[in-house]
UniProtKB/Swiss-Prot annotation:
Keywords in alphabetical order: ATP-binding, Cell membrane, Kinase, Membrane, Nucleotide-binding, Phosphoprotein, Transferase, Transmembrane, Transmembrane helix, Two-component regulatory system
Top EC class of this enzyme: transferase
Ranges per topology, Extracellular: 34-175
Modification Phosphohistidine, positions: 339
SUPFAM superfamilies (alphabetical): ATPase domain of HSP90 chaperone/DNA topoisomerase II/histidine kinase, PYP-like sensor domain (PAS domain), Sensory domain-like, Sporulation response regulatory protein Spo0B
Name of the protein in question: Probable C4-dicarboxylate sensor kinase
Domain Histidine kinase: 315-531
Major place of residence: membrane
Cytoplasmic side: 1-12, 197-532
Amino acid sequence: MRLFRQLSIQWKITILSFGIVAFALMMVSISLLGYVTSIKEDELSNRTMITAQLVAQNHTVQQWVDAKPEEASRTLQPIVERIRVINDHDYIVLLNMDRIRITHPIPERLQTPFVGGDEDPAFAEHIYLSKAKTEGVVTVRAFMPILNQQREQVGVAVVGSVLPSYADMIQEFWQPALLIGLITALFGFWGSWLLASHIKRQTFNMEPDELAHLLVERDASFNAIHEGVVAINKHEKITIMNEAARRMLGVKEKAIGRNIHEVIPDTKLPEILSIGKPLYQREFYIQGRLVFSNRIPIQIDGETVGAIAIFQDKSDVDRLAEELTGVQAFVDALRVQNHEYSNKLHTIAGLIQLDEGKKALQYIFDLEEEQEEFSGVVMQKIHNDSLAGLLLGKVSRGKELGVQVIIEKDSEFIDHPEGVTTHDLVVIVGNLIDNSLDAFSSTQDQNKTVHVFIGEENDFLKIRVRDNGEGIREEVREKMFVRGFSTKSTSGRGIGLFLIQAIVERVEGKIEVESELNIGTTFSIYLPKKRG
Protein backbone atom coordinates (compact mmCIF):
# COMPACT_ATOMS: atom_id res chain seq x y z
CA MET A 1 0.00 0.00 0.00
CA ARG A 2 2.87 2.37 0.80
CA LEU A 3 4.40 1.64 -2.60
CA PHE A 4 1.06 2.44 -4.27
CA ARG A 5 0.87 5.80 -2.49
CA GLN A 6 4.34 6.67 -3.74
CA LEU A 7 3.34 6.14 -7.38
CA SER A 8 2.53 9.11 -9.61
CA ILE A 9 -1.10 9.95 -10.31
CA GLN A 10 -0.67 8.68 -13.87
CA TRP A 11 0.35 5.19 -12.69
CA LYS A 12 -2.36 5.15 -10.03
CA ILE A 13 -5.05 5.93 -12.59
CA THR A 14 -3.59 3.36 -14.99
CA ILE A 15 -3.55 0.58 -12.39
CA LEU A 16 -7.02 1.42 -11.11
CA SER A 17 -8.52 1.66 -14.60
CA PHE A 18 -6.86 -1.57 -15.72
CA GLY A 19 -8.08 -3.30 -12.55
CA ILE A 20 -11.63 -2.23 -13.35
CA VAL A 21 -11.25 -3.49 -16.92
CA ALA A 22 -9.84 -6.82 -15.70
CA PHE A 23 -12.63 -7.25 -13.16
CA ALA A 24 -15.25 -6.42 -15.79
CA LEU A 25 -13.63 -8.90 -18.18
CA MET A 26 -13.75 -11.62 -15.53
CA MET A 27 -17.43 -10.93 -14.78
CA VAL A 28 -18.26 -10.98 -18.48
CA SER A 29 -16.36 -14.25 -18.93
CA ILE A 30 -18.26 -15.91 -16.07
CA SER A 31 -21.58 -14.66 -17.43
CA LEU A 32 -20.66 -15.76 -20.94
CA LEU A 33 -19.63 -19.20 -19.67
CA GLY A 34 -22.99 -19.63 -17.96
CA TYR A 35 -24.81 -18.42 -21.06
CA VAL A 36 -22.95 -20.81 -23.39
CA THR A 37 -23.57 -23.70 -20.96
CA SER A 38 -27.28 -22.88 -20.95
CA ILE A 39 -27.36 -22.82 -24.75
CA LYS A 40 -25.52 -26.15 -24.85
CA GLU A 41 -28.06 -27.66 -22.43
CA ASP A 42 -30.99 -26.45 -24.53
CA GLU A 43 -29.38 -27.87 -27.64
CA LEU A 44 -28.79 -31.29 -26.03
CA SER A 45 -32.34 -31.35 -24.67
CA ASN A 46 -33.80 -30.71 -28.11
CA ARG A 47 -31.57 -33.31 -29.77
CA THR A 48 -32.35 -35.86 -27.07
CA MET A 49 -36.11 -35.39 -27.47
CA ILE A 50 -35.89 -35.63 -31.27
CA THR A 51 -33.90 -38.88 -31.06
CA ALA A 52 -36.35 -40.33 -28.52
CA GLN A 53 -39.22 -39.53 -30.86
CA LEU A 54 -37.32 -41.09 -33.78
CA VAL A 55 -36.70 -44.32 -31.85
CA ALA A 56 -40.28 -44.56 -30.57
CA GLN A 57 -41.65 -44.22 -34.10
CA ASN A 58 -39.37 -46.92 -35.54
CA HIS A 59 -41.59 -49.84 -36.78
CA THR A 60 -39.09 -52.50 -35.75
CA VAL A 61 -38.96 -51.07 -32.25
CA GLN A 62 -42.76 -50.97 -32.06
CA GLN A 63 -43.00 -54.63 -33.16
CA TRP A 64 -40.26 -56.12 -30.97
CA VAL A 65 -40.16 -54.10 -27.75
CA ASP A 66 -42.92 -56.16 -26.11
CA ALA A 67 -41.52 -59.52 -27.27
CA LYS A 68 -39.57 -61.80 -24.98
CA PRO A 69 -36.67 -59.81 -23.50
CA GLU A 70 -33.95 -62.09 -24.91
CA GLU A 71 -35.34 -62.04 -28.44
CA ALA A 72 -36.17 -58.33 -28.29
CA SER A 73 -32.61 -57.48 -27.17
CA ARG A 74 -31.01 -59.52 -29.96
CA THR A 75 -33.17 -57.75 -32.54
CA LEU A 76 -33.22 -54.16 -31.25
CA GLN A 77 -29.79 -53.73 -29.61
CA PRO A 78 -27.87 -53.32 -32.92
CA ILE A 79 -30.48 -50.98 -34.37
CA VAL A 80 -30.64 -48.74 -31.31
CA GLU A 81 -26.85 -48.65 -30.86
CA ARG A 82 -26.44 -47.53 -34.45
CA ILE A 83 -28.92 -44.68 -33.85
CA ARG A 84 -27.12 -43.75 -30.60
CA VAL A 85 -23.72 -43.54 -32.22
CA ILE A 86 -24.97 -41.60 -35.21
CA ASN A 87 -26.75 -39.03 -33.03
CA ASP A 88 -23.94 -38.89 -30.46
CA HIS A 89 -25.91 -39.74 -27.31
CA ASP A 90 -24.54 -41.38 -24.20
CA TYR A 91 -27.24 -44.02 -24.01
CA ILE A 92 -30.57 -45.14 -25.47
CA VAL A 93 -32.58 -47.50 -23.31
CA LEU A 94 -35.78 -49.25 -24.42
CA LEU A 95 -38.11 -50.46 -21.67
CA ASN A 96 -40.98 -52.88 -22.03
CA MET A 97 -44.12 -52.48 -19.97
CA ASP A 98 -42.49 -54.50 -17.19
CA ARG A 99 -39.74 -51.82 -17.06
CA ILE A 100 -37.10 -54.28 -18.20
CA ARG A 101 -34.18 -52.85 -20.18
CA ILE A 102 -34.40 -54.23 -23.73
CA THR A 103 -31.41 -52.18 -24.96
CA HIS A 104 -28.47 -50.58 -23.17
CA PRO A 105 -24.97 -49.45 -24.22
CA ILE A 106 -23.59 -51.68 -21.43
CA PRO A 107 -24.49 -55.31 -22.32
CA GLU A 108 -24.37 -56.44 -18.67
CA ARG A 109 -27.43 -54.33 -17.94
CA LEU A 110 -29.64 -55.93 -20.59
CA GLN A 111 -32.81 -57.64 -19.33
CA THR A 112 -32.44 -55.92 -15.93
CA PRO A 113 -35.02 -53.66 -14.28
CA PHE A 114 -34.74 -49.93 -14.96
CA VAL A 115 -33.63 -47.89 -11.93
CA GLY A 116 -34.39 -44.20 -12.15
CA GLY A 117 -37.45 -43.20 -10.22
CA ASP A 118 -38.60 -40.64 -12.79
CA GLU A 119 -40.04 -43.02 -15.41
CA ASP A 120 -43.58 -43.41 -14.06
CA PRO A 121 -45.22 -40.62 -16.13
CA ALA A 122 -43.77 -42.17 -19.31
CA PHE A 123 -45.75 -45.37 -18.74
CA ALA A 124 -48.87 -43.20 -18.64
CA GLU A 125 -48.08 -41.98 -22.20
CA HIS A 126 -46.47 -38.68 -21.06
CA ILE A 127 -43.61 -37.11 -22.99
CA TYR A 128 -41.08 -35.13 -20.92
CA LEU A 129 -37.47 -34.32 -20.08
CA SER A 130 -35.72 -34.86 -16.77
CA LYS A 131 -32.28 -34.46 -15.24
CA ALA A 132 -30.53 -37.13 -13.27
CA LYS A 133 -27.16 -37.22 -11.54
CA THR A 134 -25.44 -40.57 -11.87
CA GLU A 135 -21.82 -41.48 -11.29
CA GLY A 136 -20.86 -37.84 -10.70
CA VAL A 137 -22.30 -36.48 -13.94
CA VAL A 138 -25.59 -34.80 -14.77
CA THR A 139 -27.56 -36.18 -17.69
CA VAL A 140 -30.62 -34.88 -19.45
CA ARG A 141 -33.07 -37.65 -20.36
CA ALA A 142 -35.98 -37.67 -22.78
CA PHE A 143 -38.86 -40.07 -22.08
CA MET A 144 -41.04 -41.07 -25.03
CA PRO A 145 -43.83 -43.72 -24.86
CA ILE A 146 -43.74 -46.39 -27.60
CA LEU A 147 -47.11 -47.14 -29.22
CA ASN A 148 -47.88 -50.05 -31.59
CA GLN A 149 -50.03 -49.91 -34.70
CA GLN A 150 -53.19 -50.19 -32.59
CA ARG A 151 -52.09 -47.08 -30.60
CA GLU A 152 -51.48 -49.17 -27.53
CA GLN A 153 -48.44 -48.47 -25.36
CA VAL A 154 -45.94 -51.29 -25.55
CA GLY A 155 -42.90 -49.64 -23.94
CA VAL A 156 -40.83 -46.50 -23.31
CA ALA A 157 -37.80 -45.06 -25.09
CA VAL A 158 -35.27 -43.28 -22.85
CA VAL A 159 -32.50 -41.23 -24.50
CA GLY A 160 -29.81 -39.66 -22.29
CA SER A 161 -26.94 -37.23 -22.87
CA VAL A 162 -24.37 -36.05 -20.34
CA LEU A 163 -24.49 -32.27 -19.79
CA PRO A 164 -21.12 -30.53 -20.09
CA SER A 165 -19.73 -29.09 -16.83
CA TYR A 166 -18.06 -25.67 -16.47
CA ALA A 167 -14.72 -27.46 -16.51
CA ASP A 168 -15.66 -29.15 -19.79
CA MET A 169 -16.65 -25.80 -21.30
CA ILE A 170 -13.42 -24.16 -20.17
CA GLN A 171 -11.40 -27.03 -21.59
CA GLU A 172 -13.25 -26.75 -24.87
CA PHE A 173 -12.95 -22.98 -25.29
CA TRP A 174 -9.80 -22.08 -23.33
CA GLN A 175 -7.67 -21.27 -26.36
CA PRO A 176 -9.97 -18.69 -28.01
CA ALA A 177 -10.96 -17.39 -24.56
CA LEU A 178 -7.30 -16.89 -23.63
CA LEU A 179 -6.60 -15.10 -26.92
CA ILE A 180 -9.59 -12.78 -26.47
CA GLY A 181 -8.63 -12.15 -22.83
CA LEU A 182 -5.06 -11.22 -23.74
CA ILE A 183 -6.17 -8.87 -26.51
CA THR A 184 -8.76 -7.26 -24.22
CA ALA A 185 -6.23 -6.89 -21.41
CA LEU A 186 -3.73 -5.33 -23.81
CA PHE A 187 -6.21 -2.79 -25.11
CA GLY A 188 -7.49 -2.21 -21.57
CA PHE A 189 -4.01 -1.37 -20.33
CA TRP A 190 -3.35 0.81 -23.37
CA GLY A 191 -6.65 2.66 -22.91
CA SER A 192 -5.98 3.10 -19.19
CA TRP A 193 -2.58 4.58 -19.93
CA LEU A 194 -4.07 6.98 -22.52
CA LEU A 195 -6.77 8.04 -20.05
CA ALA A 196 -4.21 8.62 -17.32
CA SER A 197 -2.02 10.61 -19.72
CA HIS A 198 -5.00 12.75 -20.75
CA ILE A 199 -5.91 13.48 -17.13
CA LYS A 200 -2.28 14.29 -16.40
CA ARG A 201 -2.22 16.81 -19.26
CA GLN A 202 -5.52 18.31 -18.09
CA THR A 203 -3.92 18.98 -14.70
CA PHE A 204 -0.91 20.62 -16.40
CA ASN A 205 1.31 17.65 -15.47
CA MET A 206 0.89 18.44 -11.79
CA GLU A 207 0.46 15.95 -8.97
CA PRO A 208 -2.53 16.23 -6.57
CA ASP A 209 -0.41 17.66 -3.75
CA GLU A 210 0.96 20.29 -6.14
CA LEU A 211 -2.58 21.19 -7.22
CA ALA A 212 -3.67 21.45 -3.58
CA HIS A 213 -0.74 23.75 -2.82
CA LEU A 214 -1.56 25.87 -5.87
CA LEU A 215 -5.22 26.11 -4.78
CA VAL A 216 -4.21 27.34 -1.33
CA GLU A 217 -1.93 29.95 -2.89
CA ARG A 218 -4.71 31.05 -5.24
CA ASP A 219 -7.21 31.50 -2.40
CA ALA A 220 -4.68 33.46 -0.37
CA SER A 221 -3.93 35.71 -3.34
CA PHE A 222 -7.59 36.44 -4.08
CA ASN A 223 -8.34 37.17 -0.42
CA ALA A 224 -5.44 39.63 -0.34
CA ILE A 225 -7.00 41.68 -3.16
CA HIS A 226 -8.87 44.78 -2.00
CA GLU A 227 -11.42 44.52 -4.84
CA GLY A 228 -14.21 41.96 -4.73
CA VAL A 229 -13.68 38.95 -7.00
CA VAL A 230 -16.37 36.45 -8.03
CA ALA A 231 -15.88 33.70 -10.63
CA ILE A 232 -18.28 31.10 -12.04
CA ASN A 233 -17.88 28.06 -14.27
CA LYS A 234 -19.88 27.31 -17.43
CA HIS A 235 -22.63 25.75 -15.29
CA GLU A 236 -23.06 29.08 -13.42
CA LYS A 237 -21.63 27.55 -10.22
CA ILE A 238 -19.50 29.85 -8.04
CA THR A 239 -15.84 28.79 -8.04
CA ILE A 240 -14.24 31.88 -6.47
CA MET A 241 -15.54 34.47 -4.00
CA ASN A 242 -12.95 36.35 -1.98
CA GLU A 243 -13.49 38.06 1.37
CA ALA A 244 -13.84 41.52 -0.19
CA ALA A 245 -16.66 40.25 -2.42
CA ARG A 246 -18.37 38.68 0.60
CA ARG A 247 -18.30 42.02 2.40
CA MET A 248 -19.58 43.97 -0.60
CA LEU A 249 -22.32 41.46 -1.42
CA GLY A 250 -23.25 40.78 2.20
CA VAL A 251 -22.76 37.02 1.76
CA LYS A 252 -22.28 35.14 5.03
CA GLU A 253 -23.14 31.54 4.17
CA LYS A 254 -21.06 29.16 2.04
CA ALA A 255 -21.09 30.25 -1.61
CA ILE A 256 -18.54 28.03 -3.39
CA GLY A 257 -20.29 25.38 -5.49
CA ARG A 258 -23.71 27.05 -5.36
CA ASN A 259 -25.55 28.54 -8.33
CA ILE A 260 -24.76 32.23 -8.51
CA HIS A 261 -28.46 33.13 -8.83
CA GLU A 262 -29.04 31.64 -5.38
CA VAL A 263 -26.36 33.84 -3.81
CA ILE A 264 -26.68 36.99 -5.95
CA PRO A 265 -30.21 36.95 -7.44
CA ASP A 266 -29.77 40.08 -9.59
CA THR A 267 -26.36 39.14 -10.95
CA LYS A 268 -25.49 39.76 -14.58
CA LEU A 269 -22.29 37.73 -14.58
CA PRO A 270 -23.85 34.69 -16.39
CA GLU A 271 -24.54 36.82 -19.46
CA ILE A 272 -20.78 36.88 -20.08
CA LEU A 273 -20.97 33.11 -20.67
CA SER A 274 -23.36 33.64 -23.58
CA ILE A 275 -21.80 36.70 -25.22
CA GLY A 276 -18.19 35.61 -24.62
CA LYS A 277 -16.96 39.23 -24.49
CA PRO A 278 -15.74 41.38 -21.59
CA LEU A 279 -17.80 44.25 -20.17
CA TYR A 280 -15.81 46.99 -18.45
CA GLN A 281 -16.81 49.67 -15.92
CA ARG A 282 -20.49 48.72 -15.62
CA GLU A 283 -22.10 50.27 -12.55
CA PHE A 284 -24.80 48.97 -10.22
CA TYR A 285 -25.84 49.08 -6.57
CA ILE A 286 -25.00 46.48 -3.95
CA GLN A 287 -26.36 46.91 -0.43
CA GLY A 288 -27.04 50.59 -1.18
CA ARG A 289 -23.46 51.14 -2.38
CA LEU A 290 -22.57 52.17 -5.92
CA VAL A 291 -19.88 49.92 -7.36
CA PHE A 292 -18.26 49.39 -10.74
CA SER A 293 -17.50 46.00 -12.16
CA ASN A 294 -15.32 44.54 -14.86
CA ARG A 295 -16.73 41.24 -16.12
CA ILE A 296 -14.40 39.08 -18.20
CA PRO A 297 -14.93 35.65 -19.82
CA ILE A 298 -12.52 32.82 -18.97
CA GLN A 299 -11.57 31.07 -22.20
CA ILE A 300 -9.52 27.96 -22.93
CA ASP A 301 -8.66 27.18 -26.56
CA GLY A 302 -11.30 29.67 -27.69
CA GLU A 303 -14.09 28.12 -25.60
CA THR A 304 -15.72 30.09 -22.80
CA VAL A 305 -15.51 27.91 -19.68
CA GLY A 306 -16.38 30.52 -17.07
CA ALA A 307 -16.49 34.20 -16.19
CA ILE A 308 -14.94 36.42 -13.53
CA ALA A 309 -16.13 39.74 -12.13
CA ILE A 310 -14.03 42.31 -10.27
CA PHE A 311 -15.98 44.80 -8.12
CA GLN A 312 -14.66 48.22 -7.15
CA ASP A 313 -16.20 50.61 -4.66
CA LYS A 314 -17.02 54.12 -5.88
CA SER A 315 -14.53 55.66 -3.47
CA ASP A 316 -11.73 53.68 -5.12
CA VAL A 317 -12.31 55.16 -8.58
CA ASP A 318 -11.78 58.87 -8.09
CA ARG A 319 -10.91 59.50 -11.71
CA LEU A 320 -14.18 58.03 -12.93
CA ALA A 321 -16.08 59.86 -10.16
CA GLU A 322 -14.65 63.12 -11.45
CA GLU A 323 -16.01 62.34 -14.93
CA LEU A 324 -19.42 61.55 -13.44
CA THR A 325 -19.78 64.70 -11.30
CA GLY A 326 -18.95 67.00 -14.19
CA VAL A 327 -16.53 69.15 -12.18
CA GLN A 328 -14.89 70.42 -15.34
CA ALA A 329 -18.29 71.43 -16.73
CA PHE A 330 -18.98 73.66 -13.69
CA VAL A 331 -15.54 75.28 -13.99
CA ASP A 332 -16.21 76.09 -17.65
CA ALA A 333 -19.65 77.47 -16.76
CA LEU A 334 -18.18 79.82 -14.13
CA ARG A 335 -15.57 81.05 -16.60
CA VAL A 336 -18.23 81.77 -19.24
CA GLN A 337 -20.49 83.52 -16.72
CA ASN A 338 -17.62 85.68 -15.49
CA HIS A 339 -16.82 86.75 -19.05
CA GLU A 340 -20.49 87.45 -19.85
CA TYR A 341 -21.13 89.62 -16.79
CA SER A 342 -17.88 91.48 -17.32
CA ASN A 343 -19.18 92.62 -20.74
CA LYS A 344 -22.53 93.63 -19.25
CA LEU A 345 -20.86 95.70 -16.53
CA HIS A 346 -18.77 97.48 -19.17
CA THR A 347 -21.97 98.34 -21.04
CA ILE A 348 -23.60 99.80 -17.91
CA ALA A 349 -20.45 101.78 -17.07
CA GLY A 350 -20.35 103.24 -20.60
CA LEU A 351 -23.98 104.38 -20.45
CA ILE A 352 -23.37 106.11 -17.11
CA GLN A 353 -20.30 107.92 -18.48
CA LEU A 354 -22.48 109.19 -21.35
CA ASP A 355 -25.00 110.54 -18.83
CA GLU A 356 -27.52 107.99 -20.08
CA GLY A 357 -28.64 106.99 -16.62
CA LYS A 358 -32.18 106.15 -17.67
CA LYS A 359 -30.94 103.87 -20.43
CA ALA A 360 -28.48 102.23 -18.03
CA LEU A 361 -31.29 101.64 -15.54
CA GLN A 362 -33.55 100.25 -18.26
CA TYR A 363 -30.73 97.97 -19.42
CA ILE A 364 -30.36 96.66 -15.86
CA PHE A 365 -34.12 96.06 -15.63
CA ASP A 366 -34.04 94.20 -18.96
CA LEU A 367 -31.16 92.02 -17.77
CA GLU A 368 -32.94 91.34 -14.50
CA GLU A 369 -36.17 90.40 -16.28
CA GLU A 370 -34.30 88.13 -18.68
CA GLN A 371 -32.37 86.49 -15.87
CA GLU A 372 -35.46 86.08 -13.69
CA GLU A 373 -37.42 84.56 -16.56
CA PHE A 374 -34.69 82.03 -17.22
CA SER A 375 -33.72 81.39 -13.60
CA GLY A 376 -37.36 81.13 -12.60
CA VAL A 377 -37.86 78.10 -14.82
CA VAL A 378 -34.68 76.45 -13.61
CA MET A 379 -34.63 77.27 -9.90
CA GLN A 380 -38.38 76.93 -9.31
CA LYS A 381 -38.97 73.83 -11.41
CA ILE A 382 -35.69 71.95 -10.96
CA HIS A 383 -35.56 70.97 -7.27
CA ASN A 384 -31.97 69.81 -7.33
CA ASP A 385 -29.16 72.32 -6.88
CA SER A 386 -26.52 70.31 -8.77
CA LEU A 387 -28.80 69.71 -11.75
CA ALA A 388 -30.04 73.32 -11.77
CA GLY A 389 -26.47 74.61 -11.60
CA LEU A 390 -25.48 72.33 -14.47
CA LEU A 391 -28.34 73.64 -16.63
CA LEU A 392 -27.43 77.28 -15.89
CA GLY A 393 -23.83 76.54 -16.78
CA LYS A 394 -24.78 74.81 -20.05
CA VAL A 395 -26.97 77.78 -21.04
CA SER A 396 -24.02 80.10 -20.48
CA ARG A 397 -21.72 77.76 -22.36
CA GLY A 398 -24.17 77.75 -25.27
CA LYS A 399 -24.15 81.55 -25.43
CA GLU A 400 -20.36 81.50 -25.67
CA LEU A 401 -20.60 79.08 -28.60
CA GLY A 402 -23.42 80.97 -30.28
CA VAL A 403 -26.00 78.30 -29.47
CA GLN A 404 -29.27 79.08 -27.70
CA VAL A 405 -29.88 76.46 -24.98
CA ILE A 406 -33.57 76.55 -24.06
CA ILE A 407 -34.90 74.92 -20.90
CA GLU A 408 -38.52 74.17 -21.78
CA LYS A 409 -41.00 75.87 -19.45
CA ASP A 410 -43.00 72.71 -18.73
CA SER A 411 -39.88 71.05 -17.32
CA GLU A 412 -40.08 70.02 -13.68
CA PHE A 413 -37.91 67.84 -11.49
CA ILE A 414 -39.05 67.01 -7.96
CA ASP A 415 -37.53 63.71 -6.85
CA HIS A 416 -35.05 61.12 -8.03
CA PRO A 417 -36.29 57.91 -9.64
CA GLU A 418 -35.52 54.79 -7.64
CA GLY A 419 -31.85 53.83 -7.96
CA VAL A 420 -30.85 57.08 -9.74
CA THR A 421 -28.43 59.49 -8.03
CA THR A 422 -27.68 63.15 -8.65
CA HIS A 423 -24.42 62.08 -10.28
CA ASP A 424 -26.40 59.91 -12.71
CA LEU A 425 -28.59 62.87 -13.71
CA VAL A 426 -25.54 65.12 -14.13
CA VAL A 427 -23.92 62.51 -16.37
CA ILE A 428 -27.03 62.07 -18.53
CA VAL A 429 -28.04 65.73 -18.92
CA GLY A 430 -24.49 67.07 -19.15
CA ASN A 431 -23.33 64.62 -21.81
CA LEU A 432 -26.49 64.97 -23.92
CA ILE A 433 -26.23 68.78 -23.97
CA ASP A 434 -22.49 68.58 -24.73
CA ASN A 435 -23.20 66.26 -27.67
CA SER A 436 -25.85 68.68 -28.98
CA LEU A 437 -23.42 71.60 -28.71
CA ASP A 438 -20.83 69.55 -30.59
CA ALA A 439 -23.41 68.93 -33.33
CA PHE A 440 -23.00 72.59 -34.43
CA SER A 441 -19.22 72.41 -34.79
CA SER A 442 -19.35 72.12 -38.58
CA THR A 443 -22.60 73.93 -39.40
CA GLN A 444 -22.90 77.56 -40.54
CA ASP A 445 -26.57 77.89 -39.58
CA GLN A 446 -27.16 81.05 -37.52
CA ASN A 447 -30.25 79.65 -35.77
CA LYS A 448 -28.58 77.15 -33.47
CA THR A 449 -30.86 75.88 -30.71
CA VAL A 450 -30.84 73.12 -28.14
CA HIS A 451 -34.11 72.32 -26.32
CA VAL A 452 -33.93 70.56 -22.95
CA PHE A 453 -36.91 68.98 -21.22
CA ILE A 454 -36.87 67.25 -17.82
CA GLY A 455 -40.15 66.03 -16.37
CA GLU A 456 -42.40 63.15 -15.48
CA GLU A 457 -44.25 61.22 -18.14
CA ASN A 458 -46.48 58.37 -16.96
CA ASP A 459 -44.30 56.32 -14.58
CA PHE A 460 -41.00 57.60 -15.95
CA LEU A 461 -38.71 60.57 -15.52
CA LYS A 462 -38.17 61.76 -19.09
CA ILE A 463 -35.06 63.63 -20.17
CA ARG A 464 -35.20 64.94 -23.74
CA VAL A 465 -32.49 66.93 -25.50
CA ARG A 466 -33.29 68.12 -29.03
CA ASP A 467 -31.05 70.10 -31.38
CA ASN A 468 -31.17 71.29 -34.99
CA GLY A 469 -27.58 70.38 -35.69
CA GLU A 470 -26.00 68.27 -38.41
CA GLY A 471 -27.64 64.96 -37.32
CA ILE A 472 -26.04 61.54 -36.86
CA ARG A 473 -24.88 59.37 -39.74
CA GLU A 474 -26.11 55.76 -39.80
CA GLU A 475 -22.63 54.25 -39.40
CA VAL A 476 -22.09 56.43 -36.31
CA ARG A 477 -25.44 55.43 -34.75
CA GLU A 478 -24.39 51.76 -34.82
CA LYS A 479 -21.29 52.43 -32.69
CA MET A 480 -22.01 55.59 -30.70
CA PHE A 481 -22.70 53.72 -27.41
CA VAL A 482 -19.40 51.80 -27.58
CA ARG A 483 -16.89 52.90 -24.95
CA GLY A 484 -14.09 54.96 -26.52
CA PHE A 485 -15.86 55.58 -29.84
CA SER A 486 -15.95 59.23 -30.88
CA THR A 487 -16.15 61.25 -34.07
CA LYS A 488 -13.73 63.74 -32.48
CA SER A 489 -9.98 63.28 -32.41
CA THR A 490 -9.62 64.86 -28.96
CA SER A 491 -8.14 62.58 -26.31
CA GLY A 492 -10.47 61.36 -23.58
CA ARG A 493 -13.63 61.44 -25.69
CA GLY A 494 -16.04 58.60 -26.41
CA ILE A 495 -17.23 57.86 -22.89
CA GLY A 496 -20.35 60.04 -22.49
CA LEU A 497 -22.95 57.93 -24.31
CA PHE A 498 -21.37 54.78 -22.93
CA LEU A 499 -21.88 56.05 -19.37
CA ILE A 500 -25.46 57.09 -20.17
CA GLN A 501 -26.28 53.65 -21.54
CA ALA A 502 -24.74 52.00 -18.46
CA ILE A 503 -26.93 54.07 -16.13
CA VAL A 504 -30.10 53.44 -18.15
CA GLU A 505 -29.46 49.69 -18.31
CA ARG A 506 -28.80 49.57 -14.58
CA VAL A 507 -32.20 51.03 -13.69
CA GLU A 508 -33.96 49.14 -16.52
CA GLY A 509 -34.85 52.29 -18.44
CA LYS A 510 -34.75 52.93 -22.17
CA ILE A 511 -33.13 55.23 -24.73
CA GLU A 512 -34.78 56.54 -27.90
CA VAL A 513 -32.80 58.30 -30.63
CA GLU A 514 -34.29 60.17 -33.59
CA SER A 515 -31.96 61.82 -36.07
CA GLU A 516 -32.00 63.15 -39.62
CA LEU A 517 -28.99 64.53 -41.43
CA ASN A 518 -28.92 68.36 -41.58
CA ILE A 519 -32.20 68.51 -39.63
CA GLY A 520 -31.28 67.55 -36.10
CA THR A 521 -31.20 64.91 -33.38
CA THR A 522 -33.43 64.09 -30.42
CA PHE A 523 -32.31 61.94 -27.47
CA SER A 524 -35.07 60.75 -25.11
CA ILE A 525 -34.14 59.01 -21.87
CA TYR A 526 -36.80 57.22 -19.81
CA LEU A 527 -35.92 56.37 -16.20
CA PRO A 528 -38.61 54.38 -14.30
CA LYS A 529 -39.79 56.05 -11.09
CA LYS A 530 -39.99 52.65 -9.42
CA ARG A 531 -38.15 49.51 -10.48
CA GLY A 532 -39.78 46.11 -10.89
